């Protein structure tokens, strides 16, 4: 059975879990003005089954994880909560980790890299304060989950992956999901390159998110960030990074400064290492 086909309605939720036979495809149209209900778990699951054709089991896990994200103050903005709820994390993990899609932990996706835990993705993304008009650059496409999440916040998402086969695999995944009805992923432009140098062709960017650890802020990324733009980046030695919010300020005389703050209050949050010719 195609995992993207499920029954309509409340009765359909239970029947779908039992292998029901009446199916509905995901609508091709994407409406920025529509959000799933947040009153109850059942209402959310029913709405998503009816309107997005997703698996009620994973929808329930997504809902449960959201409650923990909110209680831990990993997500707080309504637009970011909507983006989290609209992004099926289960589509971006490997088959062997499907049952663990919404666990707190980073999960292996091959090529020596991981999909970041949902709590860290949520906090880093919420810290960016993405507006609909923003242009957002991601360094480290990885599984594709982060940019999929961002595509529910802005239609201007750019993502760079340095590992060629991973970049190809994730681009193919986006294209498959677009064909299945996730038209919001058309907003994601991808590139196989060294993210240290950013993406000058599409610069400047209002927001930049880096999903791998490095011991300094790459100057090309700072140059491609707009004045008052925000970068969220794990900075520090291997395995001992602090997730930094860096805000670029430009004085009247043209000088540039960076205002830094630690979004985890000094806690160490380990990330896979930045790779490339200027990784450290």
Predicted region positions:
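Class I SAM-dependent transferase core
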Residues: 26-132, 267
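Boundary at the C-terminal end of the N-terminal hydrophobic targeting segment
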Residues: 22-24
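Active-site capping/gating segments
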Residues: 236-280
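Conserved nucleotide-cofactor-binding alpha/beta core module
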Residues: 129-250
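N-terminal secretory signal peptides and thylakoid transit peptides that target proteins
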Residues: 1-13
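Short amphipathic alpha-helical surface patches that mediate protein-protein
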Residues: 11, 85-89, 226
């Amino acid at each position: 059975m195609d995992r993207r086909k499920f029954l309509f309605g409340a009765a359909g939720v239970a029947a779908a879990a039992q292998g029901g036979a009446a199916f509905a495809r995901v609508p091709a149209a994407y409406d920025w003005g529509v959000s799933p209900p947040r009153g109850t778990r059942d209402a959310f699951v029913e709405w998503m089954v009816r309107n997005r054709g997703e698996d009620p089991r994973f929808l329930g896990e997504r809902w449960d994880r959201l409650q923990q994200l909110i209680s831990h103050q990993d997500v707080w903005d309504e637009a970011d909560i909507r983006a989290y709820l609209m992004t099926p994390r289960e589509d971006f993990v490997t088959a062997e980790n499907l049952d663990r899609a919404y666990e707190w932990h980073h999960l292996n996706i091959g090529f020596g890299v991981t999909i970041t835990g949902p709590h860290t993705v949520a906090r880093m993304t919420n810290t960016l304060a993405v507006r609909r008009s923003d242009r957002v650059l991601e360094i480290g496409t990885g599984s594709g989950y982060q940019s999929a999440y961002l595509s529910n916040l802005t239609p201007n998402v750019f993502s760079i992956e340095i590992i060629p086969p991973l970049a190809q695999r994730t681009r193919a995944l986006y294209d498959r999901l677009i064909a299945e009805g996730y038209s919001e992923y058309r907003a994601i432009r991808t590139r196989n390159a060294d993210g240290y140098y950013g993406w000058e062709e599409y610069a400047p960017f209002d927001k930049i998110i880096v999903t791998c650890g490095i011991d300094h802020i790459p100057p090309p990324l700072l140059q491609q960030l707009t004045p008052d733009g925000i970068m969220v980046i794990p900075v520090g030695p291997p395995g001992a990074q602090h997730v930094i919010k860096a805000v670029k300020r430009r004085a009247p005389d043209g000088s540039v400064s960076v205002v830094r703050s630690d979004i985890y209050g000094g806690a160490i949050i380990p990330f896979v290492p930045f790779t490339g010719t200027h990784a450290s």
